[in-house]
C-alpha cells in the first residue's frame, strides 16, 4: 500500500504487464500502418511514459509530438477540457495516432478529435493504455487498447493524484 496526499493505493498492474501491453499495441500499429509514417501524438502530462515506451517498441519510421489538455482536478473528471498547448506542424494528409494514458469519460478524446478534424489529417487513430469501459460513453472508436479496467481511480506510470505518483513504475488503484 502506498500513500499519496490523503489517499491510499494498492498494487493493480505491474511493470511487466504494462510493457507487454505496450509492445502488443506497437505491433498492432506497425501492422496497420503499412508504409505510412505516422505522427504519434502524446497527450501530456499523463502519457509521457506511455509514449516514450511505445516509440521505443515501434520498429518503423515515425514522428512524435505532444499536446497538453486537462480535464482532471483531484480524483474526479471536471467535464471541461481546456486546451493548453497545441501543435505547431501541419498534419494535413498525415496519419495521426493519438496516444493516451487513460480514457474514461472520453471528453479529452472528443476535444482532440475536433482539433484534428480541422487539420485535414489522412486518418486518425486512437491508442490508449487504459480504458474504463463503464465510464466511456462516446461514439468515437478506440483503435488500440492496452487494458480495460474498472472505473476506479489509478496512479503510477505517468498518472498522478494531484501531482504525485507519476514516477511510480507500476499502476496502483485507489483503496
Name what the model sees in each region.
Residues 1-175:
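PRPP-associated nucleotide enzymes
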Amino acid at each position: 500500500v502506498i500513500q499519496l496526499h490523503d489517499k491510499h493505493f494498492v498494487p493493480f498492474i505491474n511493470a511487466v504487464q504494462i510493457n507487454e501491453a505496450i509492445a502488443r499495441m506497437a505491433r498492432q500499429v506497425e501492422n496497420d500502418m503499412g508504409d505510412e509514417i505516422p505522427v504519434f501524438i502524446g497527450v501530456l502530462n499523463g502519457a509521457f511514459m506511455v509514449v516514450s515506451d511505445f516509440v521505443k517498441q515501434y520498429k518503423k519510421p515515425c514522428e512524435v509530438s505532444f499536446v497538453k489538455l486537462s480535464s482532471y482536478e483531484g480524483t474526479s473528471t471536471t467535464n471541461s477540457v481546456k486546451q493548453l498547448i497545441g501543435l505547431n506542424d501541419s498534419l494535413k494528409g498525415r496519419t495521426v495516432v493519438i496516444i493516451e494514458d487513460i480514457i474514461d469519460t472520453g471528453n479529452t478524446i472528443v476535444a482532440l478529435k475536433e482539433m484534428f478534424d480541422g487539420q485535414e489529417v489522412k486518418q486518425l487513430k486512437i491508442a490508449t493504455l487504459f480504458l474504463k469501459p463503464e465510464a466511456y460513453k462516446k461514439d468515437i472508436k478506440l483503435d488500440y487498447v492496452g487494458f480495460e479496467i474498472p472505473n476506479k481511480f489509478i496512479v503510477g506510470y505517468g498518472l498522478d493524484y494531484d501531482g504525485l505518483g507519476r514516477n511510480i513504475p507500476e499502476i496502483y488503484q485507489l483503496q
